[in-house]
């Protein structure tokens, strides 16, 4: 089994491209991770996701602990076997979903107590329990338990939240079972305050995580403020470890973040947009519901090799989406995931050539 490692092969200014080696194979960076919240990427077969070029998927601790439960998944051979995916899987810690989805959520030093959004059952999620669940799932990359600081937050509010995340990171690290080829990432917080981001990074770097995530962005602060934070935050992190920007997925944001030193991304945008009839293309977004596509016999993109573009016209996709056929969601999602993986491939090629990004989609 391979050791977990990050090898930077090319660098252009702050942008890096390389390979992350894991127990479940290699992943190319910069990488985009399709979101498989409940053990599936919506409207896609796992093998179809792999065909788009994805090297890694994201799963969600909160949803999987509720249904079908981590204990059931481990009895069935682990998440990889359960969902028929043999490449790396990253699982988030569940904290964000607990705080955003559950009813009567209460945050204490111990963790977060909450009621299930499904049936109202009461749970307690702590750093130790979150780490245990991710271990049971067999996650290739485990995320430390954190509090995602809401925006806007005053300096003092952000400081209190960041310090709690640091204490939880210590407990997450102590609970993590180290195995060859597996990793745990710490999550730096601090909202839009440079002083807090620097302190958070300093504290977490001392815990020697295998990689680091920048959390608490894309929560309403806007692109300008997000990029301002990314102008300095990655510089506080080790050069030789992966950097993951959580929940960011607009193409222009990915390109801007890569140019600021980010290596990994996840977002529901390509899948959710596909199910809602929106396609991403090199020429901008296409709302396939628009009546102007009803008689359009051309593909979404002429040079895209996904099944939607190879075999079907915009008129057919328009028809499927307008009448609510499942195939419409499948084809639109397949196209969008292909687009995002092609975008990452293009980004990696530009870094290898030492070229500035001259595209924004």
UniProtKB/Swiss-Prot annotation:
Q: Which Pfam families match?
A: TGT (PF01702)
Cofactor section: Zn(2+)
Q: Which parts of the sequence bind substrate?
A: 92-96, 146, 189, 216
Record-listed E.C. numbers? 2.4.2.29
This protein's pathway reads: tRNA modification; tRNA-queuosine biosynthesis
Entry annotation: catalytic residues: 92, 266
Q: Which GO terms describe its cellular component?
A: cytoplasm
Q: Where is this region: RNA binding?
A: 247-253, 271-275
Tell me which Gene Ontology terms the entry assigns under biological process.
Answer: queuosine biosynthetic process; tRNA wobble guanine modification; tRNA-guanine transglycosylation
- The record lists Zn(2+) as bound by 304, 306, 309, 335
Keywords from UniProt, A to Z, are: Glycosyltransferase, Metal-binding, Queuosine biosynthesis, Transferase, tRNA processing, Zinc
This chain's function reads: Catalyzes the base-exchange of a guanine (G) residue with the queuine precursor 7-aminomethyl-7-deazaguanine (PreQ1) at position 34 (anticodon wobble position) in tRNAs with GU(N) anticodons (tRNA-Asp, -Asn, -His and -Tyr). Catalysis occurs through a double-displacement mechanism. The nucleophile active site attacks the C1' of nucleotide 34 to detach the guanine base from the RNA, forming a covalent enzyme-RNA intermediate. The proton acceptor active site deprotonates the incoming PreQ1, allowing a nucleophilic attack on the C1' of the ribose to form the product.
Q: Which PANTHER family match?
A: QUEUINE TRNA-RIBOSYLTRANSFERASE
Query: What interactions and quaternary structure are annotated?
Result: Homodimer. Within each dimer, one monomer is responsible for RNA recognition and catalysis, while the other monomer binds to the replacement base PreQ1.
- Please report which protein family the annotation says this sequence is part of: Belongs to the queuine tRNA-ribosyltransferase family.
- Its recorded name reads Queuine tRNA-ribosyltransferase
The gene designation is tgt
